[in-house]
């Protein structure tokens, strides 16, 4: 409402003169000032948006990136608008001059001027629409003008791949725009002459022969001929470009130009080009001939010629050849083109150097575990992200207004040991504040940031089946110096959506501290400083209106932080990049950072099979790092060989940094992206078949293995991280993996055995390298879905599950993981949790371990594993929490919890007494959490 009053108050400044003239019945002046007022308001809105956005970019150090795109969009807007109205004005003035009578005719003159004014008025929306559409294609223009070569040529036209990635999309946009303008031009000409016919009664009673002899008809066909010259030129360009688009043909079994495309479709396009060139000359001739009938004859002949070529040459003949010549001889004719499809698809998805290793699975768990196996086993993830989040929500929430957006998986070197951790940030969610606390000051000046982190090892838990935390509570307590957090405040996060003002006269809420709250003042440099009236006006226009001028809490040192959620913040700066679905945060040198994988993609890589909707080229070329306190955004180029990112770096030299400039503490946390491996695996499941004959018959086609998620529902496994030791390595490393099963056309009866596993390496110099474990084809290797079925059908496990469900608890299954070990052994692990129907806090109750045909089941991972390897029992204590507190410490902690619970209960009673039932319900939820901690 205050924003509305602010808008009205500014509007009055501009509209008061108009109101004064309106009162004096000076309507023309009143209208003039009203238009000036509207233009001024629009100008102020545009100015405030551009000015405030430029200040935001300047604070991040990317002002040059903002201005470059803004000016490029303005240039495209003007270019598109000018071209559009140039064509329109040419047609209008040609008509107006030819329609003027030879002698004086005031009535005809006035009507012609009326038509002229209407036509001219239409040019304004045409200019705006054409300019807006053109400016929206700034990314294609940017790449076109900053193109770099790929150093590879397509096999048909021998053009560098860069032409298809950088030039072809922009050329397509230009040709499509001109085609639309040609259509509009014809409609405009038709409208002008129809209006003339209606106003001046040109046509009534005229037979066709008589009509063709009139000056009106001659002017009409002459102007249409001139437009056809323009349109035919555009169609020549369109047909010429269509030749290159054969490299994305879907005809037949090949994606890309196949036998029919190159032996029938391409020659037909060449014939069409010759025919269009002939028609262009005919239309040029028709523009100057004095015979209307001859011109109409040219139209009909050209239409028949082009229609015949289009229908017969471009549609019917290629389909006949495909059906009768190619389909009966498909494999021998299409094999060379299948080879191209395989080769270029692998190149486009970065799959040319996958190291394939035979892994003759040993179904027996017998033998001694190597030291590397023990390291792998001690790092296997038992906590599922969604289940750990549910536990965190119960044990580490602290207050209702905190929120854990998700759980991230990463590795840390703790005491010299590579350890896989699961981490959750405690962000602030103002929507969870009590209704009476949702005030302007609370939402924008006091509750400004989240606080701290929660971290737990992936496989350690207490005797109660809860996680053993390495970082917990507020302020955060870290069990290892490598996990210390010197700056735990989170001003920029995954779910930090609102704007805030910092460095105000009010102290910010920091974290709850006993009966009071700790307070804080922001000391960073993020945001826009509110040190002038002009800045305050621009901020008020976008955000808080009059409140910004009436509040007494702002000082010249105050700052506004906006666009604080990482997703929008990063995408605003680099909208031309594609981003992974999952960003993750890391702790490095005592600070919290977000890391986000960004991709360069394209849809026009020749002969490459599309996926991800339309894209058929992808590179993980950029690692984005965002400081959770300062809000800084850094773009590190992780694949400098990618021509697409080199083009963007050429356009924005100050935006991208070399990967070597990334601090080592952050490099240690770079991961291979989950989305990228999922996409590559989807492609490699088919394109690992390099032989055209095998590929054609799909003899060895795979798909990503599936796992049961409900009673009769299965879905593909998502990539998961492991600590593993690969054959060519002398140490354990962090890898991302995904299993494959044979492809099945019948989804109701899939082939569920496992045929391979792909590993993506995440560490050091081996980052990004892919390794494939190929399993034997001559014997059964159980897949995840089969293992899941066996677990559910095991008699002992089934009885326990039934008993737990009957006791009112809900059984939840964790992620089913396949883990390769030494001696070509393949181990499956699945944890089982139970949670009460009230409280929703899962606890680990059983772990299932499977080797081949043998299944083991225990109350802990070690217990289940020790049935295969008795020596593992000695290390069971490693994954059980050791008592970390003395009895006195536990007693003191329990005393604090009792006091806190009593206070929460008293708060609940007070709220109930006041009739504030919603707030009382929230107070009761908080009491429940405290009581859960006391268990």
Give residue ranges: language-model regions.
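Soluble extracytoplasmic regions of secretory-pathway and membrane proteins
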Residues: 15, 20-21, 39-914, 918-934
